[in-house]
Amino acid sequence: MDIIGLKNDKIQPVKSDEIEYELESPNSFFGLHANLIPMQGAVQGPRLFYGSKFQNQALPLINSEEPLVQTLVDGDEEGRSFDDIAGRSAGASWSPVGGEIVRTGSDEIEILGDDGEKHEIPIYNNFLFNRKTSIHSKPVVAKGQRVEAGQILAKSNYTNDRGTLSLGLNAKIGVVPYKGFSLDDSIAISENFAKRLS
């Protein structure tokens, strides 16, 4: 029996005894950051490039929001969403131990653990990327505060106070297709939303 699979870099019918492994989700073909690009499911390559540019241009500098609709990660015992896990690689920092905050600085947070040892957790301080962007973390805890292991210590400009990836603003939009071809589509937004963007 033939199954549709990926063989020699092409999607084609494959005999079942030739299959070496199976992916749980089609999104597993792409990495964490590639899955953030809008229009990734498009069958036309140029649309994928448009989407990556659109995302870069659409990111607000301040007051970003986590998505209203999030996808849970299969098999995650804590019930975290894709955006929760992505936030961990977007500059947010968590406490490795329970203890008391001794010091919060611009580049690290120091914790006196319940084990009596000091733990220094580095955070990003205007860390520059190569394309006119940077990542900056800001502590969400204060000196003298008690923290538990796994509690968020610092958020970044790409996450919210809970450490969830927050890249944009939630909006109700209208999609206006061009002659039904879905190639030169337009997106209509409200005046109120336009004011929120500025």
Model regions: which residues?
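Long, charge-dense accessory insertions within large macromolecular proteins
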Residues: 1-138, 148-198
